[in-house]
Amino acid sequence: MLKLLGALLILSVGVFSAFVSVQYEKKRLTVIDGWIDLILYIRGQIDCYLLPIDDILSGGDRALFEACMSPSNAADLPAMLEASGIYLDGDAKHTLESFVREIGAGYREEQLKRCDFFISSLRNQRERIAAALPMRVRLCATLC
């Protein structure tokens, strides 16, 4: 009886590990989508109103910040990047670090071009992650 209970416990831990790993892989894609949406929102605000970044973020929808894993919905780009860092690979993290560092500096046209560059770069990375997602999900399920 104890052997059966032990076997069931080991099996349930494996299933739980696989479930958590698959959710993590899907969350990686969701976080990238959240950052793309946030940069699109910031770009639109810069294009229409040319507000400072703090004013843009204070007027943003909380769902934008939640998608980027913002701690307690703080409209603070460095804090959001730090909170979402666990879900970002090296390229995406480097791209977003550059975005956080460069946004708000320069003229309107320059900021719009930089936003377009970061959106394009993140979309390319998102496509790469989305293409690898089924393989990574199968790998997580197989290993666990």
Task: Kindly give the residue locations of the regions a language model identified.
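Glycine- and small-hydrophobic-enriched helix-loop-helix hairpins
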Residues: 35, 45-109, 113-119
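Membrane-interface, cytosolic juxtamembrane amphipathic helix immediately N-terminal to a transmembrane helix
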Residues: 104-144
